[in-house]
């Protein structure tokens, strides 16, 4: 069991409240984040049978109900008290660690069963890939990657007229105050700390809220 003080990190510098708040209050408490007790099994499992790999890209196209029987999804804390979002979102995941990509893909497919998820291990190919494919609804970025870091990618995306409104979520071990301030400066919308062991409902609320805020800006 992780510490109850472990929370998802926004790019804002939070002061946790004196008393824990429920996830229903999650986005109504501006400037604060809830304390969460989490215990999620994130051991790597078998790669889903419907994935196919070419060069550094793995695409997950089919709904989660086509997962092979031996593929397990992370355990939720308590009852499964969330309703999956059935939107056909397109998510791009960027991390030089393939295990981290598989873990995050598995979680997102549980929350968004009809999502189209693409994994990229090579951060140098991200901008060219974004320019050559249909638009994505959100990009999940590792920060510490060789050659091109997540912060540099975020900065370049925000400088692009075609990509500047693309929702960006960081998933990283670097979550000190100065790190979060830098992520905010380069335009990252939200930051999750690693290990990525948050209750499903919290992840769903965060991603939905980030997407909704960006859509409202259009």
Swiss-Prot record:
One of its GO terms (biological process) is phosphorelay signal transduction system. InterPro entries: Bact_response_regulator, CheY-like_superfamily, Sig_transdc_resp-reg_receiver. Keywords: Phosphoprotein. It comes from the Eukaryota. The modification 4-aspartylphosphate is found at residue 142. Transmembrane segments: none annotated. SMART domains: REC. Residues 90-209 form the Response regulatory domain. Required for stress adaptation, morphogenesis and virulence. This is Stress response regulator protein 1. It comes from Meyerozyma guilliermondii (strain ATCC 6260 / CBS 566 / DSM 6381 / JCM 1539 / NBRC 10279 / NRRL Y-324) (Yeast).
């Amino acid at each position: 069991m992780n510490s109850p003080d472990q929370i998802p990190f926004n790019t804002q510098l939070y002061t946790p409240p004196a008393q824990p708040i429920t996830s229903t209050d999650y986005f109504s408490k501006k400037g604060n984040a809830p304390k969460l007790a989490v215990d999620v099994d994130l051991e790597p499992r078998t790669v889903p049978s419907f994935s196919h790999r070419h060069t550094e890209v793995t695409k997950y196209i089919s709904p989660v109900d086509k997962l092979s029987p031996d593929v397990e999804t992370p355990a939720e804390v308590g009852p499964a008290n969330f309703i999956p979002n059935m939107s056909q979102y397109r998510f791009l995941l960027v991390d030089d660690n393939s295990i981290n990509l598989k873990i995050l893909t598995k979680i997102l497919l549980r929350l968004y069963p009809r999502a189209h998820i693409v994994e990229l291990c090579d951060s140098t190919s991200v901008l060219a890939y974004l320019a050559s494919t249909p638009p994505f609804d959100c990009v999940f970025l590792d920060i510490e990657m060789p050659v091109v870091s997540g912060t540099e990618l975020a900065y370049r995306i925000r400088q692009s007229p075609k990509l500047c409104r693309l929702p960006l979520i960081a998933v990283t071990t670097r979550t000190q105050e100065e790190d979060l301030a830098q992520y905010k400066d380069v335009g990252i919308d939200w930051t999750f700390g690693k290990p990525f062991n948050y209750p499903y409902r919290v992840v769903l609320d965060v991603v939905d809220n980030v997407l909704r805020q960006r859509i409202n800006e259009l």
